[in-house]
Amino acid sequence: MIESQRHSYHLVDPSPWPISGSLGALATTVGGVMYMHSFQGGATLLSLGLIFILYTMFVWWRDVLRESTLEGHHTKVVQLGPRYGSISFIVSEVMFLFAFFRASSHSSLAPTVEIGGIWPPKGIGVLDPREIPFLNTPILLSSGAAVTWAHHAILAGKEKRAVYALVATVSLALVFTGFQGMEYYQAPFTISDSIYGSTFFLATGFHGFHVIIGTLFLIICGIRQYLGQMTKEHHVGFEAAAWYWHFVDVVRLFPFVSIYWWGGI
Protein backbone atom coordinates (compact mmCIF):
# COMPACT_ATOMS: atom_id res chain seq x y z
CA MET A 1 0.00 0.00 0.00
CA ILE A 2 1.48 3.34 -1.07
CA GLU A 3 1.50 6.00 1.64
CA SER A 4 0.42 9.49 0.60
CA GLN A 5 1.15 12.76 2.37
CA ARG A 6 -1.76 15.20 2.45
CA HIS A 7 -0.07 18.02 4.37
CA SER A 8 2.81 20.48 3.90
CA TYR A 9 4.82 19.42 6.93
CA HIS A 10 8.00 17.36 6.93
CA LEU A 11 7.85 14.30 9.16
CA VAL A 12 11.55 13.63 9.68
CA ASP A 13 12.99 10.13 9.65
CA PRO A 14 14.56 8.63 12.80
CA SER A 15 18.01 10.15 13.30
CA PRO A 16 20.93 9.33 15.62
CA TRP A 17 22.22 12.91 15.64
CA PRO A 18 20.17 14.34 18.55
CA ILE A 19 21.44 11.69 20.95
CA SER A 20 24.99 11.92 19.60
CA GLY A 21 24.94 15.69 20.03
CA SER A 22 23.67 15.26 23.59
CA LEU A 23 26.47 12.80 24.38
CA GLY A 24 29.01 15.21 22.90
CA ALA A 25 27.65 18.06 25.03
CA LEU A 26 27.81 15.83 28.13
CA ALA A 27 31.40 14.83 27.41
CA THR A 28 32.36 18.46 26.77
CA THR A 29 30.80 19.64 30.02
CA VAL A 30 32.25 16.88 32.19
CA GLY A 31 35.63 17.11 30.46
CA GLY A 32 35.70 20.88 30.89
CA VAL A 33 35.01 20.63 34.61
CA MET A 34 37.63 17.90 35.01
CA TYR A 35 40.19 19.92 33.06
CA MET A 36 39.60 23.08 35.10
CA HIS A 37 40.04 21.12 38.33
CA SER A 38 43.18 19.35 37.02
CA PHE A 39 41.67 15.86 36.98
CA GLN A 40 43.53 13.29 34.89
CA GLY A 41 41.91 12.73 31.48
CA GLY A 42 39.93 15.97 31.58
CA ALA A 43 41.63 17.49 28.54
CA THR A 44 41.16 14.27 26.55
CA LEU A 45 37.46 14.04 27.39
CA LEU A 46 36.97 17.72 26.60
CA SER A 47 38.67 17.33 23.21
CA LEU A 48 36.66 14.22 22.35
CA GLY A 49 33.43 15.97 23.31
CA LEU A 50 34.20 18.97 21.10
CA ILE A 51 35.14 16.72 18.18
CA PHE A 52 31.92 14.75 18.66
CA ILE A 53 29.85 17.95 18.65
CA LEU A 54 31.56 19.26 15.51
CA TYR A 55 31.05 15.94 13.74
CA THR A 56 27.38 15.86 14.76
CA MET A 57 26.87 19.41 13.48
CA PHE A 58 28.44 18.51 10.14
CA VAL A 59 26.47 15.33 9.48
CA TRP A 60 23.19 16.74 10.83
CA TRP A 61 23.35 19.82 8.60
CA ARG A 62 24.40 17.57 5.72
CA ASP A 63 21.19 15.57 6.20
CA VAL A 64 19.11 18.75 6.38
CA LEU A 65 20.61 19.94 3.08
CA ARG A 66 19.85 16.58 1.49
CA GLU A 67 16.25 16.71 2.71
CA SER A 68 15.78 20.19 1.27
CA THR A 69 17.86 20.04 -1.92
CA LEU A 70 17.54 16.44 -3.09
CA GLU A 71 14.31 15.22 -1.48
CA GLY A 72 12.26 18.44 -1.67
CA HIS A 73 10.85 18.20 1.85
CA HIS A 74 11.22 21.90 2.65
CA THR A 75 7.90 23.37 1.56
CA LYS A 76 6.95 26.99 2.24
CA VAL A 77 5.37 25.91 5.52
CA VAL A 78 8.48 23.99 6.58
CA GLN A 79 10.70 26.97 5.71
CA LEU A 80 8.92 29.06 8.34
CA GLY A 81 10.53 26.99 11.11
CA PRO A 82 14.16 27.80 10.22
CA ARG A 83 13.21 31.44 9.64
CA TYR A 84 11.60 31.85 13.06
CA GLY A 85 14.43 29.90 14.67
CA SER A 86 17.06 32.13 13.06
CA ILE A 87 15.29 35.29 14.21
CA SER A 88 14.99 33.95 17.77
CA PHE A 89 18.68 33.00 17.79
CA ILE A 90 19.75 36.45 16.57
CA VAL A 91 17.59 38.15 19.23
CA SER A 92 19.29 36.03 21.91
CA GLU A 93 22.70 37.02 20.56
CA VAL A 94 21.70 40.70 20.68
CA MET A 95 20.96 40.27 24.39
CA PHE A 96 24.30 38.52 24.87
CA LEU A 97 26.33 41.31 23.27
CA PHE A 98 24.25 43.99 24.99
CA ALA A 99 25.41 42.61 28.34
CA PHE A 100 29.07 43.08 27.38
CA PHE A 101 28.55 46.60 26.05
CA ARG A 102 26.53 47.46 29.13
CA ALA A 103 29.41 46.30 31.33
CA SER A 104 31.78 48.57 29.44
CA SER A 105 29.38 51.53 29.61
CA HIS A 106 28.81 51.02 33.33
CA SER A 107 32.55 51.00 34.01
CA SER A 108 33.21 54.07 31.87
CA LEU A 109 30.30 56.19 33.14
CA ALA A 110 30.97 55.43 36.81
CA PRO A 111 34.68 54.60 37.20
CA THR A 112 35.56 53.41 40.68
CA VAL A 113 38.29 54.71 42.95
CA GLU A 114 40.30 51.52 42.35
CA ILE A 115 41.06 52.72 38.82
CA GLY A 116 41.57 56.35 39.81
CA GLY A 117 38.01 57.52 39.18
CA ILE A 118 38.80 58.18 35.51
CA TRP A 119 38.20 56.41 32.20
CA PRO A 120 40.31 54.98 30.69
CA PRO A 121 42.07 53.92 33.90
CA LYS A 122 45.32 55.65 34.72
CA GLY A 123 48.31 53.98 33.10
CA ILE A 124 46.35 52.29 30.28
CA GLY A 125 47.55 53.13 26.78
CA VAL A 126 44.46 53.01 24.57
CA LEU A 127 44.08 52.42 20.84
CA ASP A 128 43.47 55.40 18.59
CA PRO A 129 39.88 55.06 17.28
CA ARG A 130 40.83 57.01 14.15
CA GLU A 131 43.20 54.30 12.94
CA ILE A 132 42.35 50.57 12.54
CA PRO A 133 38.98 50.78 14.37
CA PHE A 134 37.79 53.56 12.07
CA LEU A 135 39.02 51.68 8.99
CA ASN A 136 37.49 48.37 10.05
CA THR A 137 34.00 49.79 10.62
CA PRO A 138 33.24 50.79 6.98
CA ILE A 139 34.86 47.56 5.80
CA LEU A 140 32.36 45.50 7.76
CA LEU A 141 29.45 47.75 6.81
CA SER A 142 30.46 47.41 3.15
CA SER A 143 30.32 43.64 3.50
CA GLY A 144 26.71 44.06 4.63
CA ALA A 145 25.99 45.92 1.39
CA ALA A 146 27.67 43.13 -0.57
CA VAL A 147 25.54 40.41 1.04
CA THR A 148 22.43 42.46 0.18
CA TRP A 149 23.69 42.55 -3.41
CA ALA A 150 23.97 38.76 -3.31
CA HIS A 151 20.41 38.45 -1.99
CA HIS A 152 19.01 40.59 -4.80
CA ALA A 153 21.01 38.57 -7.33
CA ILE A 154 19.53 35.31 -6.02
CA LEU A 155 16.00 36.73 -6.17
CA ALA A 156 16.66 37.83 -9.75
CA GLY A 157 17.95 34.38 -10.72
CA LYS A 158 21.45 35.67 -11.53
CA GLU A 159 23.55 32.82 -10.12
CA LYS A 160 27.01 34.02 -11.17
CA ARG A 161 26.39 37.52 -9.86
CA ALA A 162 25.31 36.06 -6.52
CA VAL A 163 28.55 34.07 -6.33
CA TYR A 164 30.62 37.18 -7.08
CA ALA A 165 28.75 39.13 -4.40
CA LEU A 166 29.32 36.38 -1.83
CA VAL A 167 33.03 36.26 -2.72
CA ALA A 168 33.17 40.04 -2.16
CA THR A 169 31.38 39.67 1.18
CA VAL A 170 33.70 36.93 2.41
CA SER A 171 36.78 38.85 1.21
CA LEU A 172 35.76 41.95 3.16
CA ALA A 173 35.04 39.78 6.21
CA LEU A 174 38.51 38.22 6.03
CA VAL A 175 40.10 41.67 5.72
CA PHE A 176 38.15 42.80 8.79
CA THR A 177 39.28 39.75 10.77
CA GLY A 178 42.88 40.28 9.70
CA PHE A 179 42.85 43.91 10.85
CA GLN A 180 41.19 42.85 14.10
CA GLY A 181 43.98 40.36 14.73
CA MET A 182 46.59 43.02 13.93
CA GLU A 183 44.87 45.36 16.36
CA TYR A 184 44.97 42.76 19.13
CA TYR A 185 48.63 42.02 18.42
CA GLN A 186 49.57 45.71 18.64
CA ALA A 187 47.36 46.57 21.63
CA PRO A 188 49.43 48.07 24.47
CA PHE A 189 47.26 46.34 27.10
CA THR A 190 46.01 42.82 27.80
CA ILE A 191 42.76 41.29 29.01
CA SER A 192 44.13 41.31 32.57
CA ASP A 193 44.91 45.05 32.58
CA SER A 194 42.06 46.35 34.76
CA ILE A 195 38.37 46.45 33.90
CA TYR A 196 39.21 48.32 30.68
CA GLY A 197 41.21 45.45 29.22
CA SER A 198 38.67 42.87 30.37
CA THR A 199 35.64 44.61 28.85
CA PHE A 200 37.54 45.60 25.70
CA PHE A 201 38.69 42.11 24.77
CA LEU A 202 35.49 40.44 25.94
CA ALA A 203 33.17 42.69 23.92
CA THR A 204 35.27 43.10 20.78
CA GLY A 205 36.46 39.49 20.90
CA PHE A 206 32.94 38.13 21.19
CA HIS A 207 31.89 40.29 18.25
CA GLY A 208 34.93 39.13 16.30
CA PHE A 209 34.00 35.53 17.05
CA HIS A 210 30.56 36.20 15.56
CA VAL A 211 32.23 37.62 12.46
CA ILE A 212 34.23 34.40 12.05
CA ILE A 213 31.10 32.24 12.47
CA GLY A 214 29.22 34.41 9.97
CA THR A 215 32.11 34.18 7.52
CA LEU A 216 32.01 30.37 7.65
CA PHE A 217 28.24 30.54 7.20
CA LEU A 218 28.62 32.69 4.07
CA ILE A 219 31.39 30.49 2.67
CA ILE A 220 29.04 27.49 2.82
CA CYS A 221 26.32 29.57 1.15
CA GLY A 222 28.76 30.60 -1.57
CA ILE A 223 29.73 26.98 -2.25
CA ARG A 224 26.06 25.93 -2.41
CA GLN A 225 25.27 28.84 -4.73
CA TYR A 226 28.17 27.87 -6.99
CA LEU A 227 26.84 24.29 -7.10
CA GLY A 228 23.38 25.56 -8.04
CA GLN A 229 21.69 24.35 -4.86
CA MET A 230 19.87 27.62 -4.14
CA THR A 231 17.05 29.17 -6.15
CA LYS A 232 14.95 32.29 -5.75
CA GLU A 233 12.25 30.14 -4.11
CA HIS A 234 14.53 28.01 -1.92
CA HIS A 235 17.36 29.86 -0.18
CA VAL A 236 16.42 29.83 3.50
CA GLY A 237 20.00 29.02 4.50
CA PHE A 238 21.24 32.12 2.72
CA GLU A 239 18.51 34.25 4.27
CA ALA A 240 19.56 33.09 7.73
CA ALA A 241 23.20 33.87 6.90
CA ALA A 242 22.28 37.31 5.55
CA TRP A 243 20.20 38.18 8.63
CA TYR A 244 23.03 37.01 10.87
CA TRP A 245 25.54 39.06 8.89
CA HIS A 246 23.45 42.22 9.07
CA PHE A 247 23.26 41.69 12.83
CA VAL A 248 27.05 41.40 12.94
CA ASP A 249 27.77 44.49 10.84
CA VAL A 250 25.20 46.75 12.55
CA VAL A 251 26.40 45.69 16.01
CA ARG A 252 29.90 46.84 15.01
CA LEU A 253 28.76 50.44 15.49
CA PHE A 254 28.18 49.85 19.20
CA PRO A 255 31.74 48.79 20.16
CA PHE A 256 33.16 51.50 17.92
CA VAL A 257 31.21 54.22 19.73
CA SER A 258 31.05 52.84 23.27
CA ILE A 259 34.52 51.25 23.50
CA TYR A 260 36.90 52.65 20.87
CA TRP A 261 35.66 56.23 20.61
CA TRP A 262 34.37 56.76 24.17
CA GLY A 263 37.41 55.08 25.69
CA GLY A 264 40.00 56.44 23.29
CA ILE A 265 39.26 60.13 22.83
Swiss-Prot record:
GO terms for cellular component: mitochondrial inner membrane. It catalyses: 4 Fe(II)-[cytochrome c] + O2 + 8 H(+)(in) = 4 Fe(III)-[cytochrome c] + 2 H2O + 4 H(+)(out). Pfam families: COX3 (PF00510). Its main location: mitochondrion. Belongs to the cytochrome c oxidase subunit 3 family. Component of the cytochrome c oxidase (complex IV, CIV), a multisubunit enzyme composed of a catalytic core of 3 subunits and several supernumerary subunits. The complex exists as a monomer or a dimer and forms supercomplexes (SCs) in the inner mitochondrial membrane with ubiquinol-cytochrome c oxidoreductase (cytochrome b-c1 complex, complex III, CIII). This is Cytochrome c oxidase subunit 3.
